[in-house]
From Swiss-Prot:
It is an enzyme of class 1 (oxidoreductase). Homohexamer. The lineage of its organism: Eukaryota, Metazoa, Chordata, Craniata, Vertebrata. It comes from Hylobates lar (Lar gibbon). It holds the Pfam family ELFV_dehydrog_N. This is Glutamate dehydrogenase 2, mitochondrial. The gene is GLUD2.
Length: 555
């Protein structure tokens, strides 16, 4: 439920003054008045009695309640605007009740499927596998969210990740509701044959309950899953319940190219992390607050987690001039102040199965999260940055490559310490953005650019010829004496953009546009470096608008 307890809890006539001078200053700032206090979202939530629902376990909060707490901060900021923007013939009180009612609808997880099924292992023994699929919101359909294989999967985790997917899709304007799935296994303990059995059976269980389909719910890769598992899912669905559905392969994204996948999907999340950092690190106003110069040129960074997201984030930052000085994994960390080459480290890990022992770096003692660097990229799992270690973090920019790596208490500490946190619901949205492109490709049954490649190339050459002929007529020259020659960059462009070029361009545009929206919201509400609350405000506004304009039918 939406954690708003009502004005009855305030003394008669209470308002901003009830917060004291500091709280009133914060509230005034949230309404656009100048003030020096740094966290208006927290103060306004306190005044309106939005529950900071994570207070029960400050250093290890319930993951779903943690996301709800962040939602409440954004809701407390944007509520007045939502009331003001309602174009209904209702009183102020009725409008506010309507707004709060819709916000209550947005917050909970709509459906959670818990299931178990048996498999026969290669040694002849039998095992019961547990799995979950949570659908947070159907304000847009289909629902969208990854499938992870982990022994630590829980109902709380998939609910939290599903809710994050709803807000993430809204932030980057991808028309999906949020969902997430988890299978409670450690994939390292199973053979490929056993993993295929588990994946195909899990797909059938989802299909029987109506939790998968091109227009219903579309999974994607996540922790410990990739193209292989997505291909099994697509084949299982298309061969059974989707046998008569021409769009059957759109039931899942992150597939191999031969199965309807899209170029650029594997690197999409890491590339999105790079673009997310790029948009803020090149913004002089934010860099001046942090006491840093714009650009990647002189920056150092640390990556926690050398999986798909960590590797590709590292690649792109390295390519644009930043220096990776440390990488951390679950079995240990390595350090080299002169820099670590991502390709060399990737090759070493593929050969040895671990980053430990990499000859061009030394073992790092202590927490990699507390290493001295400019940019920290936590790309492992949730709740890594907590109240305990946040005071010792030395980075000035934290880019949340993982989902939910920062607890609310740590988030408050970072704001107090003037550390910029680029939030997960924006910075790791590259994966779902490119999944959206793949889903559209599957529905259209044609790859991007195939219908226009040659036409665009010929049009560009005709344009150059037209310019050349016009100049020759003007100066009385004929026969190609004033040749118009394209530059090398333009020549590459007009020779025909590949599908990967189109995907990369669209992803960069999406991340840039979303970053500008977050910056404008942060400026509008005087949120300073509280980019997370700004992103939640944007997400809440967009989801609220869908519910408000569609109407709440069956109530």
């Amino acid at each position: 439920m939406y954690c708003y307890l009502g004005k009855a809890l305030l003394p008669s006539g209470a308002g901003p003054a009830a917060l004291g001078s500091a709280g009133a200053a914060l509230l005034g700032r949230a309404r656009g008045q100048p003030a020096a206090a740094p966290q208006p979202g927290l103060a306004l939530a306190a005044w309106r009695h939005y529950s900071e629902v994570v207070a029960d376990r400050k250093d290890d909060p319930n993951f779903f309640k943690m996301v709800e707490g962040f939602f409440d901060r954004g809701a407390s900021i944007v509520e007045d605007k939502l009331v003001k923007d309602l174009r209904t013939r209702e009183s102020e009180e009725q409008k506010r009740n309507r707004v709060r009612g819709i916000l209550r609808i947005i917050k909970p997880c709509n459906h959670v499927l818990s299931l178990s099924f048996p498999i026969r292992r290669d040694d002849g023994s039998w095992e019961v596998i547990e799995g979950y699929r949570a659908q947070h919101s159907q304000h847009r359909t289909p629902c969208k969210g990854g499938i992870r294989y982990s022994a630590d999967v829980s109902v709380d985790e998939v609910k939290a990740l599903a809710s994050l997917m709803t807000y993430k899709c809204a932030v980057v304007d991808v028309p999906f509701g949020g969902a997430k799935a988890g299978v409670k296994i450690n994939p390292k303990n199973y053979t490929e044959n056993e993993l295929e059995k588990i994946t195909r059976r899990f797909t059938m269980e989802l299909a029987k309950k109506g939790f998968i389909g091109p227009g219903i719910d579309v999974p994607a890769p996540d922790m410990n899953t990739g193209e292989r598992e997505m291909s099994w899912i697509a084949d299982t669905y298309a061969s059974t319940i989707g046998h008569y559905d021409i769009n059957a392969h759109a039931c899942v994204t992150g597939k191999p190219i031969s199965q309807g996948g899209i170029h650029g999907r594997i690197s999409a999340t890491g590339r999105g992390v790079f673009h997310g950092i790029e948009n803020f690190i090149n913004e002089a106003s934010y860099m001046s607050i942090l006491g840093m110069t714009p650009g990647f040129g002189d920056k150092t960074f640390v990556v926690q987690g050398f999986g798909n997201v960590g590797l590709h984030s590292m690649r792109y930052l390295h390519r644009f001039g930043a220096k990776c000085i440390a990488v951390g994994e679950s079995d240990g960390s390595i350090w080299n102040p002169d820099g670590i080459d991502p390709k060399e480290l990737e090759d070493f890990k593929l050969q040895h199965g671990s980053i430990l022992g990499f000859p061009k770096a030394k073992p790092y003692e202590g927490s990699i999260l507390e290493a001295d660097c400019d940019i920290l990229i936590p790309a492992a799992s949730e709740k890594q940055l907590t109240k305990s270690n946040a005071p010792r973090v030395k980075a000035k920019i934290i880019a949340e490559g993982a989902n939910g790596p920062t607890t609310p208490e740590a988030d408050k500490i970072f704001l107090e310490r003037n550390i910029m946190v680029i939030p997960d619901l924006y910075v790791n949205a590259g994966g779902v953005t490119v999944s959206y492109f793949e889903w559209l490709k599957n529905l259209n049954h044609v790859s991007y650019g195939r219908l226009t490649f040659k036409y665009e190339r010929d049009s560009n050459y005709h344009l150059l010829m037209s310019v050349q002929e016009s100049l020759e007529r003007k100066f009385g020259k004929h026969g190609g004496t004033i040749p118009i020659v394209p530059t090398a960059e333009f020549q590459d462009s007009i020779s025909g953009a590949s599908e990967k070029d189109i995907v990369h361009s669209a992803l960069a545009y999406t991340m840039e546009r979303s970053a500008r929206q977050i910056m404008r919201t942060a400026m509008k509400y005087n949120l300073g470096l509280d980019l997370r609350t700004a992103a939640y405000v944007n997400a809440i506004e967009k989801v609220f608008k869908v519910y408000s304009e569609a109407g709440v039918t069956f109530t």
